Amino acid sequence: MNLAIPNPNSHHLSFLIQNSSFIGNRRFADGNRLRFLSGGNRKPCSFSGKIKAKTKDLVLGNPSVSVEKGKYSYDVESLINKLSSLPPRGSIARCLDIFKNKLSLNDFALVFKEFAGRGDWQRSLRLFKYMQRQIWCKPNEHIYTIMISLLGREGLLDKCLEVFDEMPSQGVSRSVFSYTALINAYGRNGRYETSLELLDRMKNEKISPSILTYNTVINACARGGLDWEGLLGLFAEMRHEGIQPDIVTYNTLLSACAIRGLGDEAEMVFRTMNDGGIVPDLTTYSHLVETFGKLRRLEKVCDLLGEMASGGSLPDITSYNVLLEAYAKSGSIKEAMGVFHQMQAAGCTPNANTYSVLLNLFGQSGRYDDVRQLFLEMKSSNTDPDAATYNILIEVFGEGGYFKEVVTLFHDMVEENIEPDMETYEGIIFACGKGGLHEDARKILQYMTANDIVPSSKAYTGVIEAFGQAALYEEALVAFNTMHEVGSNPSIETFHSLLYSFARGGLVKESEAILSRLVDSGIPRNRDTFNAQIEAYKQGGKFEEAVKTYVDMEKSRCDPDERTLEAVLSVYSFARLVDECREQFEEMKASDILPSIMCYCMMLAVYGKTERWDDVNELLEEMLSNRVSNIHQVIGQMIKGDYDDDSNWQIVEYVLDKLNSEGCGLGIRFYNALLDALWWLGQKERAARVLNEATKRGLFPELFRKNKLVWSVDVHRMSEGGMYTALSVWLNDINDMLLKGDLPQLAVVVSVRGQLEKSSAARESPIAKAAFSFLQDHVSSSFSFTGWNGGRIMCQRSQLKQLLSTKEPTSEESENKNLVALANSPIFAAGTRASTSSDTNHSGNPTQRRTRTKKELAGSTA
C-alpha cells in the first residue's frame, strides 16, 4: 500500500502563512530606543504544561453545508459532504469504509483544511483521533500541524499541546513546522512567554527555527507587550543565526512602533529595512504614517520618502497615497498638495486613487471649483478615472447641492464605459431625491432595470424622495410597493421619505396608512416619524392631532429636536395662537438653540396676522443684529426692502442658492415660511419675487401648469401666505393672457390632494377655505368647488372671460394692469400698536401654560 507523502515545505508553509496573523493591533507599553547591534535580553519563562481550554460551542452536523462543486476531487468532495452531514454521535468509521485505500494523506489534508476554514474543530478532532487508530491513514506531521493550527485558532491550547505531545508516541517526528504551529497557537492567544520557551525548547532539540518561526514569535511578543529591548533581542538573535529578516519582520516591528508611538525607533527600522534591500509595501507605509501621525510629525514621512527618491530608490505610488490619506483625514489641504507636488517632482505618476483622495479632500472643504479643475487635470494627464473616482465626485457634488451636475457625471461615466456599481446608483439617486429631479431618478431606475440590476433599499428611497419632492404621490407609492416585489425591504429611511412626502402635502390619511405599515413591520417610531406626522397634521389642518402627536412623542420618551420644535411652532403659527408661538420661540432660545430662519419668519407671520407691529419691528431688529447667521441678517434686510434693486438682490440670490444646496425638503419649508411672513407684513410684491425665485430653483414644480384646455395652480403644499401669493400671480397671469386674447377652457385651483379630495370634507381644509375666500373677494363668485372633487375650485372659460372683462379694478390695480394688486406696504413703525399684557399673556409659568394648551387642543374636536 502506497501512501502519498506531501512535500512538507510547500504544504506546511502555505497553511501557516494563511492562518498566522503577523501584524497585531494591541496596546503595548512604551519601549526604549532602537539598538540593532545589541542582542537584547529576555527573561526565561517556566513552561506551565497543560492549560485550561476555552469553552467552545458544539458544531452539529448540517447537511445543508456542502462543499463547492469542482473544488476537490470526487472522493474528497464526497467525504467532506458525508462528514458534514454526520450527526454528533455518528460513526466516523462507517463514513470512511468506502474510502479505504482510496484517499492519500494529501487528500485528508484537504479535508482538514476545509473544516479548518469552517472553524469545525470538533469534527476535525474526531476524524483525527480515528486516523490515529488506523494504519492505512495514520496522520503525518503535515496533518498534525494543521490540527495544532486549527485548535490554536479556536483558543484550545490544552488540546493543541495534547496533539503536539502525542507526536513521538505516534511515531511522528517534530519539525520546525509543528513547533511553529504551536508557537503561533500560544502567541495568538496572548501567551508570548510560552512562545518564547517553545523557541528555546526547539533549539535544545536541535531543530532550527525558520524565518516564519521568528516572525511568529516576534509578532506574539509585540502583541503581548514584551518591551522594545526584548523585541530587538529577538531581531538580533535571528540575524545572528543567519536568518535574514523579511518584509513581515520589519512590518511587525513597525507595527509595534506605531502602537507604542516610537517615532525615532520606527525611523531607524525603516532605514535598516531600506539598507537591507527590502522593498516597503502598503503595510510598511501605513505603519509609518500611523506612527508619525500620532506624534503629529507626518512631515517626517515626507522627509523619508524624499531621502529614498534622492538616493535612487523611488518610492512607489502607494507610499504617497497613504501619506495623502493621512493629511486628508486631518483636512490639511496645503500639506496634501505639498505631497502631491513632491511625488510629481520625484517622477512618480499619480493614479486614480491619488486623485480620488484629493478630490474628496477639496469636496469636503467646499472647494467645488478646485474639484472640477483637479478632475479636468486628471483626465488631461491620461489618468483614467475609475468607478471609485466617480463615486467620490457624485457624493461631493450631491452633498454640495449640485444635483444636476451629479446626473451629468453619470452620463459622462457611461460614455467612458466605466461600469457603475451600487454605490454609484445610490449616490446619484440620492442626489436626485434631494434635488427633486424626479425625471432623472426615473430614468436611472429604468437604466438599472434594463441592465438587470436590482436597486437597493437606499436607491429606492432616493427614487421615492424624488417623486415626493415633486408631489408625485402615486409614483412614490408605486416605487414603495415595487420594493416588496423585487425583495428589497424598506428601511426606516424609506418609510420616513414617504411619510415626509405625504406630510408636505397634508395627505393625512396616506400618512397614517404608511405609519401603520411601519409599525406592522416591527420598526420602532423615532424622532423623524413623529416630526413627519406633526407636519402632516399641520398641513392638513388637523391642529389638535398635531399637538396630540407632540404630546405622545414626549410620553414615549422620544426627545424632540430642532425640527420638532419648528414643526410645533408652525402649527401654532398656522392656527394663529400667538401666545403659544411666543412661548415656543422663547423656549428654543432659552435652550441655547438658535431658532432657524423659518422660525423667525413664522413669528413675523403670526405677528403680522394679528397686527402686532411692535413685536414685528423688535424681531426684525433681532434678525439684523444676529452675529451668528448671515442668513438671518440678509432675509431680515430683504423683508425691510434693503435689497430691492437688482444689484443688491444678488445678495439675496446667493443666500437662496446656499439654502437650495440643502435640498428641496428644506427649501419648501423655508419658502413657505418666508412667503407667509412677507404676505402678512404687506410685502406682496417681494413675496411674488421670492415665489419666482423658488420656482426658478425647482421648488413647487406642480404649482403652475398650462395646456390648451386647462390652466391650473396647485397650492396644496403651500402656507397660507404662500397660497395667497401664488393665487395672485396666477390670476394676474390669466388677466395678461386675456388681454392677448388667449384663455383656457378651464381655470382650476388645486387646494387638496390625496384621498381627502374625493370627499366634500376637503372643502373644510384651511387652505381650501382660504383659497376659496380669496377668489370670492377678488373675482366674485365665478369660481366654485367641483362636485366630483372636493379639493378643486374651478371656473369655466365663458365665466372667466365675462368676469375679467367686467371687473372694476382699483386705482392701484389699474395702474399696474393687474387683477390683484401686488405692492409693498410700509411696515408700521414701533409704537403704532404696542403689545399689552392682555395680548401676550406673559404671566404664569410658560411650561405649565404650554402643557395646558396642548391638553386643551388635544382634547377638543375639530
From Swiss-Prot:
Tissue distribution: Mostly expressed in leaves, stems and flowers, but barely in roots.
Transit peptide: 1-66
Pfam families recorded: PPR, PPR_2, PPR_3
GO biological process: plastid transcription; positive regulation of DNA-templated transcription
Coiled coil: none
Compositional bias segments (type: Polar residues): 833-848
GO cellular component annotations of the record: chloroplast; chloroplast nucleoid
Annotated localization: Plastid, Chloroplast
Chain intervals for the UniProt region annotation (Disordered): 831-862
Keywords assigned: Chloroplast, Plastid, Repeat, Transcription, Transcription regulation, Transit peptide
Occurrences of domain Smr (ranges): 713-801
Record has Repeat as a keyword: yes
Protein family per UniProt: Belongs to the PPR family. P subfamily.
Function: Involved in plastid gene expression.
PANTHER family: MEMBRANE-ASSOCIATED SALT-INDUCIBLE PROTEIN-LIKE, OS03G0201400 PROTEIN
Protein name per the record: Pentatricopeptide repeat-containing protein At1g74850, chloroplastic
Organism of this sequence: Arabidopsis thaliana (Mouse-ear cress)
